[in-house]
Structure formats: C-alpha cells, structure tokens
Amino acid sequence: MQKRTLGNSARELATIGLGCMGLSEFYGPPTEQAAAIKLLHEAIELGVDHFDTAEMYGMRSANESLLGEAFADRRDRVFIATKFGPTRDWETGMATGIDGSRENCRRAVEGSLQRLGTDVIDLYYLHRVDPATPIEDTVTAMAELVAEGKVRYIGLSEASGDTIRRAARIHPISAVQSEYSIFARDIEADVIPACLEVGASLVAYSPLGRGMLSGRFKNETLGENDWRSANPRFQGEAYAANVALVDEIEAVAAAKSCTPAQVALAWVIGRGEHVLTIPGTTKMENLKSNLGAYEVLLSAGEQTTLDALADRVMGDRYDESGMAIING
C-alpha cells in the first residue's frame, strides 16, 4: 500500500482512498446499509485509511451517519474527511445555496461530529467557496475549530489558485480537493501550482470521470436518479464522443494486462507526490480492482497518449449551475 504525506502535515495516508458519496446518493438509490458497511470495513482491511464524505451527501447527511456507524469500533484505523458550505432543504433535497459564514461553519461542524460519532474531524473542507463571505473570514472560523481540537487539518474544495493563496495566509491549508482525471485537467494551470506553493496536497475526486473512464458505459445506461444524466459529458453527441475516447485508454490497458480504471488511476497518482485520490464505488470488486492501480506503471509513450485525450473531451464537467460554483 503506497503512502503519501498529507500536505504540510506529518500525517501519512494511503495514496488511494475512498470517496463515499455514491453509497448514499447521486448515482442511483442508496446502497443498502449493511452492504455499505461491509464495503467500508473491507476497504479498511485492504489498507484504505482515507474516507471522504460531506454534510450534503445523502438526505439529512445520511452519508456521514453511515460512516459514523461503520467506523464506531474502528475510529483509530481511519482518517475521516468531511465538508461544509453548500446548504439543502431537507424536505425536498434541493440545494439552497452556499454558506461559508462563521455561524454556519460552527453549526455544521457540531452536526458532523455528532453524526460521525467522533470528537475530532481529521480533515475539514470548505466544500465550495461562498462568494458572499471573504475566504479569510471562513478560514479564520475553521482555524478556530483546529485551536479547539474539533478539527485536525483544514482544506478547500474547488477553489481557485488565488483563493488558495489567500486562505493559506490565514492558516495552513493541508489539502485542496478538485476534480482531476485524464478527462479533467483544467486545474493544472492555476490550482495545482497554488497547491505546490502553499504545501497542500491535491485530493483528486472523480479520477475515473464519474465512471466513464472505466469503459463500462459502452454497455450500460444511466439508472433512475443518476445525476450524471444532467451532466453535459453524459449527454447526446458529447456522450458518444467521450465514450469513444475511452477506446484509447482501453488500448493502453490491454497492452498492460490491466483494466481501464487502473490505467486512469495510475495516471492520476503518477502526477506527483502531492496527489492523493478518492475514487468512489458501491461494488466490492471495483474497490479491490481500483487498488490494483498501484501496480500499474505507465511508460512515457503511454503518458503522452493519455495526456492528449483531455483536449478532445466534449462538454463541461458540470451543468451551468455546477460550473458557476467551482473555481471560486
């Protein structure tokens, strides 16, 4: 199990963690509780120690509650990251805005601590930057939580390079979470240089392009309640073109006797020691297969082939409303 240091901390984590959102929402019906807990326990046994959740994942923060139950007797073996900022109407599930105020930060952390069944959150992110609250004010509030022992490290998610630098002047930023994959490389010009400058790890979410890079969408359609159906990269002409691009990833995988998903993950973790990643899955076989990416070493020629794909991807990585709240 490959380990890397979390940003400017002394904490070492498995390079490949587990994004837990899909266990509770967004990719179809929630996974049955017992099955979800079994998968989380198996992940620990396989050497995964970094688990990512958020207040907004699952109705009434069900994903945090799931992790709290799963890790109740295993807390010393796991590193839990959660996030605050986006707000939802829990009667309808609809998003209602972003609140990075001190008041919301303190309200949210107390709820997360309770649901997670812990007295300290290992890594606490601002999930999206609140345009109405100066980042300095939000990070000051988050730093108070560190001083009070409620949070160990703080991070930002989908923040711009300028915001990262401003935040780091207030308190060390240990991690920046952004979408990063063979198909999503827009952060390389601004966000990654800022991470390196302030000593933050890049935590890459959706390293498999929301499943597209696994190659399985050639034979599957999106299920009911799958939010990807509203994602521009999964619609119409763009969907067909993007799925066709995966052929080139599959060719690399065939030559290396591995899976396309393993190639995609190897590409991400091969970008540097500052990169951690949190692929999500609801299936035990995918969990085990993803960890096989540690054994995949890409040649310079393979890297060049894969690097060229991003410029040919069609569609934004979120719909218009989603694009409006990234790179804040």
Q: Where do the PLM segments sit?
A:
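Terminal-tail/helix-coil boundary detector
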Residues: M1, E197, E224-A251, A255, ...
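N-terminal binding-site loop/beta-alpha segment at the start of enzyme catalytic domains
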Residues: M1-V78, G315, N327
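Conserved, mostly hydrophobic/aromatic
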Residues: L6, L18, A36, F51, ...
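N-terminal small/glycine-rich loop or linker at the start of catalytic domains
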Residues: S9-Y27, A81-T96, V120, Y125
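Short, well-ordered coil/turn segments that N-cap beta-strands
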Residues: R11-I16, G47-D49, R75-V78, T118-D122, ...
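Active-site beta-loop-alpha junctions enriched in small/polar residues
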Residues: M21-L23, A54-M56, K83-T87, L126-V129, ...
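Glycine/proline-rich, positively charged
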Residues: E91-D186, D190, S201
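Aromatic-lined glycan-binding groove of carbohydrate-active enzymes
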Residues: I187-G223, T259
